[in-house]
From Swiss-Prot:
Record-linked InterPro entries: MATE_fam, MATE_MdtK
Highest taxon above the source species: Bacteria
Coiled coil stretches, renumbered: none
Function comment: Multidrug efflux pump.
TM segment ranges: 10-30, 34-54, 74-94, 121-141, 179-199, 214-234, 264-284, 292-312, 335-355, 369-389, 409-429, 437-457
GO biological process: monoatomic ion transport
GO molecular function term, any single one: antiporter activity
GO cellular component terms given for this protein: plasma membrane
Organism, as annotated: Xylella fastidiosa (strain Temecula1 / ATCC 700964)
Family label: Belongs to the multi antimicrobial extrusion (MATE) (TC 2.A.66.1) family.
Predominant place of localization: membrane
Pfam family for this entry, one: MatE
Keywords: Antiport, Cell inner membrane, Cell membrane, Ion transport, Membrane, Transmembrane, Transmembrane helix, Transport
Protein name (Swiss-Prot/TrEMBL): Probable multidrug resistance protein NorM
Length: 469
């Protein structure tokens, strides 16, 4: 049922040699980045563990429940990616204002970002209200559609809480304050685990809601995290001088436009990448319940691994933004290379875990032998794309800190939708490789993005050093 483990010692040796070389030259920047990134990574890991827990609970409830939650979660993430990406502009601008010692401008900027977050939440709610009626049009197996629709009808009520939480989180990260993200992430996990279990299986006096229970638990955690974060910022002495909630401001469209000019290309870039995975999930739904369940197992593990380079990339964005605000280009470049060294190291570790322990990982999700066999094969593909996935994420973070967002958006479109998706469709459907073909498309798209974004970083940094705008 399971594949033999390959000998990858040579590849590991090359990766560790590369990391050692970069650290020897830029090691002084590795430690500050790690200190800033660690709470972010742990916060992201807690988010990934939430997905892991939900999938384990759904998978042991039934294969249909897991498949329905997979489709529902995929369609939930589609609108969530836009506010996640767009509001990153707040981190970029706050870090640069902080670096330039213009803190009096941070409070007004934050209040306008809250208006933008509410607007994005309204868009998200509208999408999640409409899309359940369109599920039959996607060609998904009919058994999955009712559960996915119920899940989406429930989770839409968290549409406002989600962007507000990220708005507050990105503000904190721009101010080099990353511990709230970690604490709220694990706090949400502690609430979600027992609540989702109770609502899905009907334990502790609750009725058995099945996949709807997963949605109810998710919405509850979204609102708890948003409310607690708001209370923290309101009461925190660290940010008292910024007067974040000193008064209510009407929307200032000029400031909101500034946020959108930087953030919308980031949001579209993230949508391009996330959309590739989401559409891949919907297309694999055509191959049957076993294929989609196996895909979700492999994807959730890959997403958990992805949380590490994501946290490192966000920390790198903040540090580069701070350096740009101080006009310190040498530090900017050193911070970027330190980020690459860290990511190569983390992705080597992630790939090693997947290659060595895929059978143990799959066993934690399901005891269905057919699903387990398919998932174990897909986890090997997940191990392969750890490197391009981490490197493209880090390059994106570096470019965001440099306020270069529009060209990376175009490069993301080319990589994911000009290369990855067409190849995945050809291999998955034309050659009938099913989910394996679609995953090869993912690997090609991520590899292209890693190469193109790395090239873009080189071009932009050389222009900045030459004084070319």
């Amino acid at each position: 049922m399971f594949l033999p483990r390959p000998d990858f010692r040579i590849a590991l040796s090359i990766c560790f040699m590369a990391v050692s070389f970069v650290i020897s030259r830029f090691g002084s920047e590795v430690r500050p980045t790690l200190l800033l990134a660690l709470p972010l990574v742990l916060g992201h890991v807690s988010t990934g563990l939430i997905g892991f827990v939900l999938n384990v609970i759904a998978g042991h409830h039934s294969t249909v429940t897991l498949a329905a939650s997979t489709i529902g979660t995929a369609l939930l993430w589609l609108p969530m990616l836009v506010p996640m990406g767009t509001l990153i502009s707040l981190t970029v601008l706050v870090s640069q204002l902080h670096g330039a010692e213009r803190e009096r401008d941070i409070g007004p900027l934050f209040r306008q970002a809250l208006w933008l977050a509410m607007l994005l939440g309204l868009v998200m709610f509208t999408f999640l209200s409409v899309v359940p009626a369109l599920l039959p049009l996607f060609g998904i197996v009919p058994d999955i559609v009712p559960g996915a629709a119920k899940f989406l009808h429930v989770v839409r009520w968290g549409s406002l809480a989600f962007p507000l939480y990220f708005c507050m989180r990105y503000f904190c990260e721009g101010m080099h304050c990353t511990f709230p993200t970690m604490l709220l992430g694990f706090g949400g996990l502690l609430v979600l685990v027992p609540l989702s279990y109770a609502l899905t299986y009907g334990r502790f006096g609750f009725a058995e809601y099945g996949v709807e229970g997963l949605g109810i638990a998710t919405v509850t955690v979204m609102w708890l995290q948003a409310v607690v974060f708001a209370l923290y910022l309101w009461r925190s002495r660290r940010f008292a001088h910024l007067q974040l909630f000193a008064h209510l401001e009407l929307p200032c469209w000029a400031r909101i436009r500034d946020l959108l000019n930087i953030g919308l290309p980031i949001g579209i870039s993230i949508l391009m990448e996330g959309g590739l995975f989401i559409v891949t999930t919907l297309l694999i739904g055509r191959f049957g319940t076993d294929e989609i369940a196996a895909h979700q197992i492999a994807l959730s593990v890959a997403q958990l691994c992805f949380m590490i380079p994501m946290g490192v990339a966000e920390a790198t964005t903040v540090r580069i933004g701070h350096a740009v605000g101080r006009c310190d280009l040498l530090v900017m470049r050193r911070v970027a290379w330190a980020g690459y060294a860290i990511v190569i190291g983390t992705q080597t570790l992630s790939a090693s875990v997947l290659l060595l322990g895929y059978d143990v990982i799959v066993a934690a999700y399901t005891d269905d032998l057919v699903v387990a066999s398919l998932a174990s094969k897909l986890l090997l593909f997940a191990a392969i794309f750890q490197f391009p996935d981490g490197l493209q994420m880090l390059s994106s973070g570096v470019l965001r800190g440099m306020k270069d967002t529009r060209v990376p958006m175009l490069l993301a479109m080319i990589s994911y939708w000009g290369l990855g998706m067409p190849l995945g469709l050809g291999l998955g459907f034309a050659l009938e490789w099913n989910s394996r073909g679609m995953w090869i498309g993912l690997i090609i798209g991520l590899t292209a993005a890693a190469l193109l974004l790395g090239w873009r970083f080189r071009v932009v940094s050389e222009r900045m050093f030459a004084g070319i705008p």
